[in-house]
A protein has these predicted regions:
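A charged helix-plus-loop insertion that forms the helical arch/lid used to bind
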Residues: 125-141
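Conserved nucleotide- and phosphate/pyrophosphate-binding catalytic cores
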Residues: 250-453
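N-terminal catalytic cores of NTP/NDP-binding nucleotidyl/phosphoryl-transfer enzymes
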Residues: 62, 67-125, 233-240
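Methionine residue identity
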Residues: 1-4, 40
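Glycine-biased, low-complexity coil/linker segments
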Residues: 3, 18-19, 32
Length: 453
């Protein structure tokens, strides 16, 4: 897609996603053949970093493939990925980007984590059908501080090996007239309105505030190029128009080449974004999603998704992953355990990963689990020293609403201390939850040890 005025050159796009055929489940024979071919090719020639990214299915589309290959394979890329601090924790939706930054840094490239402290005050319309809620500067700063801590698990910021930059440093001090003169003349409104991120908002209404988002993101790339020599931007497919805007702005203003590459979206076999549960997003903050719950999320992925997730998200050698292509049945359960352990170790550390793994095994073999997730009921949760089943399930965090708790009980999906709860009016004495507490179970895979606070 060409974003700029007439005369701007279009990016030479290479698209790795292909048609819907890429989403069809491969049969066993095809998997084995594909793994054999990959093994033969790797033995013939040493795989480059770019080749590995392609083999892992991480690249969706790129501008200048030859230039990007040269940059990242030879450790010459100073690249950035943007993170809008709209929450106080990163989540699984950010996971792919963080892993990519880690891979490229390990190969000698320099990451820039750009925190959108300025753009967060506008809100990105990409992928939205409504306007985002605007945050206060204080809320944004709190979220930025939380991001810094979580990113440090993936990126080495020591000795100038990586940069953490906030675009508020330049966006909040911009003079409007200066911006119009310097940047506005480089953009065509007609071309901007053809961008997918704006098309889907035209019928419901697009504020002028949000309309400026593309210009601001393009300006980010322009500033990062000037200040830090940033020559490559990564982002999601929904950011493609904005990213091309940045490469064209750099070309028009500085007569320099900059590149862009989009990362494959993490979708399940049904084409839906991964990283959501009935309780909401899967967060990287252990206070929002416990290491055990994080482990369980990956342990419970669909059979059709497990090998794709291992290939895209873990740092296991491709040769080792190729051997799993022929796995089926009980072997896929082993693959899920590998996936859950590797990702929990990456996000929460090896100790927490081992605890989560041990807890899961203890629970599913009927043993006791010291590290089982816990919930504390407040004293005012009880009436006449009793609590009903609906409030128990809701208070234990096994349902996001009392209506959901009611439905789960009515469907026979809840047990307390090993006994199935058949009546929504069932009540449990407060004394039952004193001491070590009682295990409350929802379905086959959600367990919480509940006690009185």
């Amino acid at each position: 897609m060409q974003i700029m005025n007439n005369g701007a050159r279009s990016a030479e796009v290479v698209n790795y996603q292909g048609s819907g055929a890429a989403k069809r489940r491969r049969d066993l024979a095809y998997k084995v053949a594909r793994a054999a071919i990959r093994k033969m090719k790797r033995e013939e020639t040493k795989m480059t970093l770019y080749d590995e990214l392609v083999a892992r299915g991480l690249i969706a589309q790129v501008t200048d493939e030859a230039l990007i290959k040269d940059l990242i394979n030879n450790g010459k890329a100073t690249f950035y990925i943007g993170f809008d601090p709209t929450a106080d924790s990163l989540h699984v939706g950010h996971f792919m980007a963080l892993c990519l930054m880690k891979r490229l840094q390990m190969a000698g490239n320099k990451p820039i984590a750009l925190i959108g402290g300025g753009t967060a005050m506008i809100g990105d319309p990409s992928g939205r059908t409504d306007m985002r809620k605007m945050l206060t500067p204080e809320q944004i700063q709190h979220n930025v501080d939380c991001f810094k801590k979580q990113m440090a698990r993936f990126i080495d910021f020591s000795d100038d090996k990586a940069l953490l930059v906030n675009n508020a440093d330049w966006l909040l001090n911009l003079n409007y007239v200066e911006l119009l003169r310097e940047v506005g003349a480089c953009f065509s409104v007609n071309n901007m309105l053809r961008a997918e991120c704006y098309k889907q908002r035209m019928e419901k209404g697009l504020s002028f505030l949000e309309f400026n988002y593309m210009i601001m993101q393009s300006y980010d790339f322009y500033m990062l190029y000037q200040k830090y020599g940033c020559n490559l931007q990564f982002g999601g497919n929904d950011q493609w128009s904005n990213m091309l805007g940045g490469t064209e702005l750099i070309r028009r203003k500085l007569d320099k080449d900059a590149s862009a590459m989009t990362i494959t979206l993490l979708l399940n076999s049904e084409g839906k974004k991964m990283g959501k549960t009935a309780s909401g997003a899967v967060w990287l903050d252990p206070d929002k999603t416990s290491p055990y719950d994080f482990y369980q999320y990956w342990r419970n992925v669909d059979d059709a998704d497990v090998l794709k997730c291992i290939r895209m998200l873990t740092f296991l050698p491709l040769e080792e992953i190729d051997k799993m292509d022929s796995w089926e049945g009980a072997q896929l359960n082993k693959a899920k355990e590998i996936l859950a352990y590797e990702l929990t170790k990456l996000v929460h550390g090896e100790e927490e990963a081992k605890k989560a793994e041990a807890t899961a095994k203890a629970i599913f073999t009927g043993g006791d689990a010291a590290n089982m997730p816990t919930a504390k009921l407040e004293a005012d949760s009880f009436t006449d020293d009793e609590i009903d089943a609906i409030n128990l399930v809701f208070g234990a965090g096994l349902a996001t609403t009392k209506s959901e708790a009611r439905r789960t009980i009515q469907q026979g999906g809840v047990s307390v201390d090993g006994e199935k709860v058949a009546d929504i009016a069932a009540k449990f004495p407060k004394s039952m939850f004193e001491g070590d507490g009682v295990v409350v179970k929802k379905g086959k895979k959600s367990f919480v040890k509940v006690s009185v606070n």
